[in-house]
């Protein structure tokens, strides 16, 4: 154990020393928290139960609506889009200054997003085919595939906004916010068609993305602006929930008439503004914490494989659920219906098992997140720094800025 700690400390020191002094470590910390929030949120509210011989998804939020505030902690996608807009706007401006073409820049960005996708889609296409050939119920296969593929909507939206960065980087967040408000008013207030809500898939996430782009240009240098986002977004969210008829949960709940997330509603966007305000307020404290080599190394390495963690976390949950069937078909918190507080406590005990399974997936598939050249050499180039070889442990600098 002592040797392991020594080796980890040495690795952390190498990562810390290889990080450029000008790098804003709080950006990486915010991205890491956003990814972990989504992963833990899914693990806490995703249950697989058998009904009428088929596997179905269930959520404790449906049986215990008073748990809705939990979703306020773990629905962190707005922070991810905030960071994404900030990094993309900075990256595009830097690439343009270096004479890099838009095509080369966007290919590099989108490659980092979609390289890991091929592996998860290929594996689950094989698994789904095997299950169907083995006689599994189509509804069971559909439930499993929905859990695996549902994160891909996020990647598609994020990729579209990334590709549009030169066009949207200077748009005021008020414009997409107005689109979201108008779509909701038409849909809920004037009986408009439901499909109009899907306009919010782009407009809703464009709000935090453009906030991030504004951040890259020097906005939010004063705490007052970030505090306004936090307080204003929080008050607006509370008003929309209490008097506007919006659900309190910031994630989808099976059987609910309205989802705040699918597509995003004005309440979800207002809540995202509050999240972004809080994220911008804690930049200073986060930057100070990130000066600790061991803490920074954990954040840096997570950023290096952020997409792998995001894409495979539901596979990890399903793997543990399937392995558990070898021992019992009624393990609390794993196979049982999420209808009581006891289920929540039991599910918490399964989180280390999910994390262990995710670690196995990470070990097997993280290679797909790296550029092909990085797989065959033990050196990498640190972006926005002199192009000299650096230790492999610092490879996060090139791969982490997605």
Where are these regions (language model features)?
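Alpha-helical transmembrane segments and their immediate juxtamembrane cytosolic regions
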Residues: 2-402
């Amino acid at each position: 154990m002592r040797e392991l700690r020594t080796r980890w400390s040495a690795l952390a020191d190498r990562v810390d020393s290889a990080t450029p002094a000008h790098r804003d470590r709080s950006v990486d910390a915010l991205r890491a928290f956003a990814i972990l929030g989504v992963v833990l949120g899914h693990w806490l509210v995703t249950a697989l139960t058998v009904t009428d011989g088929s596997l179905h998804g269930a959520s404790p939020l449906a049986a215990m609506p008073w748990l809705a505030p939990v979703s306020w902690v773990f629905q962190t996608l707005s922070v991810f889009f905030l960071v994404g807009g900030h990094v993309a706007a900075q990256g595009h401006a830097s690439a343009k200054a270096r004479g890099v073409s838009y095509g080369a820049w966007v290919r590099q960005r989108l490659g980092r997003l979609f390289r890991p996708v091929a592996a998860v889609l290929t594996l689950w296409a094989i698994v789904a085919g095997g299950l169907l050939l083995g006689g599994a119920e189509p509804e069971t296969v559909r439930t499993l595939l929905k859990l695996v593929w549902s994160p891909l909507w996020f990647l598609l939206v994020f990729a579209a906004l990334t590709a549009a960065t030169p066009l949207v980087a200077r748009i005021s967040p008020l414009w997409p916010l107005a689109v979201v408000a108008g779509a909701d008013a038409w849909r809920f207030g004037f009986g408009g068609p439901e499909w109009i809500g899907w306009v919010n898939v782009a407009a809703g996430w464009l709000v935090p993305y453009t906030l991030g782009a504004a951040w890259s240009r020097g906005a939010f240098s004063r705490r007052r602006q970030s505090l306004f986002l936090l307080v204003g977004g929080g008050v607006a969210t509370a008003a929309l929930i209490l008097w506007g008829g919006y659900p309190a949960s910031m994630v989808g709940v099976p059987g609910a008439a309205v989802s705040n997330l699918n597509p995003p509603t004005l309440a979800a966007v207002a809540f995202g503004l509050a999240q972004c305000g809080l994220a911008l307020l804690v930049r200073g404290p986060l930057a100070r914490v990130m000066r600790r080599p061991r803490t920074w190394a954990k954040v840096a390495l997570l950023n290096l494989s952020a997409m792998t963690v995001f894409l495979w976390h539901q596979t990890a949950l399903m793997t543990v659920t399937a392995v558990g069937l070898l021992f019992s078909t009624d393990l609390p918190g794993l196979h049982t219906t999420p209808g009581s507080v006891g289920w929540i406590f039991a599910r918490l005990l399964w989180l280390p098992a999910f994390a262990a399974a995710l670690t196995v997936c990470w070990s097997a598939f993280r290679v797909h997140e790296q550029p092909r050249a990085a797989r065959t050499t033990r050196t990498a180039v640190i972006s926005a720094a002199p192009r000299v070889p650096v230790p492999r442990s610092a490879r996060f600098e090139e791969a982490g800025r997605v």
